[in-house]
């Protein structure tokens, strides 16, 4: 996935009100970025470190700049725009870069499914084969070289696991795909200490036949590419 134009860089001052971040530009002036991440961004916020942002030409936007990448204290890049996760997953599947999800000829987004008024991130179809329901999760919480999910208690994430189990029970393929947007993450696990209910439900889902995949990104100021398989460990978080 290429950005419409190379990202611009700045230095982070602070993030506040969840959706805003103040930064210092290269010319020394300050501006406010839109922060497209509603999570805690635990271990992703490093005041004084570099960030990268895209710029919209939409005159109706209050904040023209969108925060895309951050840098941690070890120089790792972090993709903080959670909306990119679904885009990356769809592109990678369409290009055949996720081997476990090859062989489907149709990809649909945001299709209603399940018993709890949900919409699936991606629904794959191929002839007479069972449909494949995919929930996509962005993983950026780093603990040593582990990526943990979620970074806060997630009742929504718990609901999605229940929905995936129901789809599997009905005979479909059900997949949880972690899109790892942090260069320092080399293994993924549920965040047991943060959301033990989610961790337990995830193990229950695996036992019920839900598949779990994790893939990492190549990233720079020109774009992102999801193509690096990462091991998942259901009991290690």
From Swiss-Prot:
This chain belongs to the protein called Sugar fermentation stimulation protein homolog
Instruction: Return the similarity comment.
Output: Belongs to the SfsA family.
Query: Which superkingdom is the protein from?
Result: Bacteria
Upper taxonomic classification of the species?
Bacteria, Pseudomonadati, Pseudomonadota, Gammaproteobacteria, Alteromonadales
This protein's species is Shewanella amazonensis (strain ATCC BAA-1098 / SB2B)
Q: Which Pfam families match?
A: SfsA, SfsA_N
Spell out the PANTHER family in the cross-references. Answer: SUGAR FERMENTATION STIMULATION PROTEIN A
Could you give a GO molecular-function term held by this entry?
DNA binding
């Amino acid at each position: 996935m290429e950005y419409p134009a190379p990202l611009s860089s700045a230095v982070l001052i602070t993030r506040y009100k969840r959706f805003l971040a103040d930064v210092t530009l290269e010319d020394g002036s300050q501006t406010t970025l839109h922060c497209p991440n509603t999570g805690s961004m635990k271990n992703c916020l490093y005041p004084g470190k570099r960030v990268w942002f895209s710029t919209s030409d939409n005159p109706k936007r209050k904040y023209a700049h969108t925060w895309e990448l951050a840098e941690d204290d070890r120089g790792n890049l972090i993709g903080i725009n959670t909306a990119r996760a679904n885009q990356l997953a769809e592109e990678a599947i369409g290009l055949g870069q996720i081997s476990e999800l090859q062989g489907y000829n149709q990809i649909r987004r945001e299709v209603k499914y399940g018993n709890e008024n949900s919409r699936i991130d991606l629904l794959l179809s191929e002839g007479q084969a069972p449909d494949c329901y995919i929930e996509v999760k962005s993983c950026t919480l780093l603990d040593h070289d582990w990526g943990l999910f979620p970074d806060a208690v997630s009742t929504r994430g718990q609901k999605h696991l229940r929905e995936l189990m129901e789809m599997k029970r009905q005979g479909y393929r059900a997949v949880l795909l972690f899109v790892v947007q942090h260069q320092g993450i080399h293994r993924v696990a549920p965040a047991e200490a943060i959301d033990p209910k989610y961790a337990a439900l995830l193990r229950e889902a695996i036992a019920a036949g839900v598949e779990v995949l994790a893939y990492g990104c190549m990233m720079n100021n020109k774009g992102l590419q999801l193509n690096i398989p990462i091991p998942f460990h259901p009991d290690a978080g």
